[in-house]
């Protein structure tokens, strides 16, 4: 896409243009494995009329999904979508001396006053989840009027980025530091971090520990219930969302514990079988999205194919070691401005009264629907929230008191220590 490819003059890194292109031999291997993969027998867990999806993937769904994947799915058609926006790779050095090749999508503005925004994906997601937001931005702005530099990287170990060194116990803070170096090296000091799921952890780490990050916006806040939880008020939509959080804590966290405690086993097992990976990821995409914005089967097959073809399921499980350690990380207050989009049907919805205890919350928007995958479930709403946050946090607009879907004035906090 012409016009969005001029890096700031202050850039010190020299990215190379990147084009998504999977070899025919790897695509043939994928097809062969799909075709040869047997589907297990029907049992109570996967086929009982009374259990629904309580115990995970339904066998009849898997039979149909496998058939569609084998007979009708076209990676090359999806690959064309992935090539729409400029992409690059560049070696970036991390805090432990490691150098990792980072892949990213970029829209570089021609405005001198453009504000840098970094969008970080989670699991099981990719930078391409943000394509609907990039579509909205390029429909709304031209390269000359775009008020932001947009950077959407593949996290280390995901998609087309390189892997952390095998002799390094890599963790989310290290990934955050390395991606901070990416932004600085692109001449984008003074950036805003945005994310959900793992991306929210990256964003928070950068806001807490990286001077170049001036603020952060989250569409998910991973936070254990505060000690004073009973003293904090909840909005009605938040009260309705709390059973989701309780159910997830009781029966939905097994995948994360497996990722964190037996990442070697589950990573190798899922990479060995695309159909097994379809079960593992497909279940989460359906369970974690809102009932009004369920992913199509085509979308699920696209995501699973991308993960399998790039070995992401094996390479990208490292952040979960921290979550499964048994030690709750200390959540210190961050003074930098935070914006927050509340989508009630994610698996761990965080009420705004809880969010206020973690950072200098200056902008908040409460939505009545939407789930874990906001960039493609609710791209317009998420982009509006981010743009509102930028204006509120950096002086272009006051934070008005409005209705349930609008921004609320939630700024303020006492004196707290910065950092994680």
From Swiss-Prot:
Gene Ontology terms, MF aspect: epoxide hydrolase activity
EC number assigned by the record: 3.-.-.-
InterPro entries for the chain: AB_hydrolase_fold, Epox_hydrolase-like, Epoxide_hydro_N, Epoxide_hydrolase
Keywords carried by this UniProt record: Hydrolase
Gene Ontology BP terms: epoxide metabolic process
Signal peptide region: none
Domain of life: Eukaryota
Pfam hit, one: EHN
The protein's annotated pathway: Mycotoxin biosynthesis
Homology family: Belongs to the peptidase S33 family.
Protein role: Putative epoxide hydrolase; part of the fragmented gene cluster that mediates the biosynthesis of dothistromin (DOTH), a polyketide toxin very similar in structure to the aflatoxin precursor, versicolorin B. The first step of the pathway is the conversion of acetate to norsolorinic acid (NOR) and requires the fatty acid synthase subunits hexA and hexB, as well as the polyketide synthase pksA. PksA combines a hexanoyl starter unit and 7 malonyl-CoA extender units to synthesize the precursor NOR.
UniProt name for this protein: Putative epoxide hydrolase
Lineage, opening ranks: Eukaryota, Fungi, Dikarya, Ascomycota, Pezizomycotina
């Amino acid at each position: 896409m012409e016009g969005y490819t001029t890096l700031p003059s202050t850039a010190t890194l020299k990215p190379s243009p990147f084009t998504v292109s999977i070899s025919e031999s790897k695509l043939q291997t994928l097809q062969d494995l799909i075709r040869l993969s047997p589907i297990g027998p029907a049992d109570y867990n996967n086929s009982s009329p009374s259990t629904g999806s309580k115990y995970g993937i339904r066998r009849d769904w898997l039979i149909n999904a496998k058939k569609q994947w084998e007979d009708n799915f076209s990676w090359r058609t999806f690959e064309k979508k992935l090539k729409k926006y400029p992409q690059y790779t560049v070696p970036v050095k991390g805090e432990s001396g490691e150098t990792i090749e980072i892949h990213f999508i970029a829209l570089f503005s021609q405005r001198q006053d453009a504000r840098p925004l970094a969008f970080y994906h989670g699991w099981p997601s990719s930078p391409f989840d943000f394509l609907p937001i990039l579509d909205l931005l390029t429909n709304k702005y031209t390269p000359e009027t775009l008020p932001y530099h947009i950077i959407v990287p593949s996290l280390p170990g995901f998609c087309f980025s390189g892997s952390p060194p095998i002799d390094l116990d890599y963790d989310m803070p290290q990934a955050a530091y390395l991606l901070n170096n990416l932004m600085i090296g692109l001449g984008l000091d003074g950036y805003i971090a945005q994310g959900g799921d793992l991306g929210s952890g990256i964003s928070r780490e950068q806001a807490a520990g990286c001077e170049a990050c001036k603020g952060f916006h989250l569409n998910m806040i991973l936070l254990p219930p505060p000690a004073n939880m009973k003293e904090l008020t909840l909005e009605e939509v938040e009260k309705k969302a709390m059973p989701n959080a309780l159910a997830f804590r009781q029966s939905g966290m097994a995948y994360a514990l497996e990722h964190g405690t037996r990442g070697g086993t589950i990573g190798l097992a899922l990479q060995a079988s695309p159909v097994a990976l379809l079960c593992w990821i497909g279940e989460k995409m359906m369970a974690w999205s809102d009932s009004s914005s369920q992913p199509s089967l085509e979308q699920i097959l696209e995501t699973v194919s991308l993960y399998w073809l790039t070995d992401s399921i094996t390479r990208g499980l490292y952040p979960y070691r921290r979550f499964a350690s048994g030690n709750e990380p200390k959540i210190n207050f961050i003074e930098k401005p935070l914006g927050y989009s509340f989508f009630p049907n994610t698996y761990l919805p965080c009420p705004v009264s809880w969010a206020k205890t973690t950072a200098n919350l200056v902008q908040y928007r409460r939505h009545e629907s939407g789930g874990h995958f906001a960039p493609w479930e609710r791209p317009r709403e998420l982009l509006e929230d981010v743009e509102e946050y930028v204006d509120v946090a950096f002086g272009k607009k006051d934070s008005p008191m409005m209705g349930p879907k609008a921004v609320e004035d939630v700024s303020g906090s006492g004196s707290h220590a910065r950092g994680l």
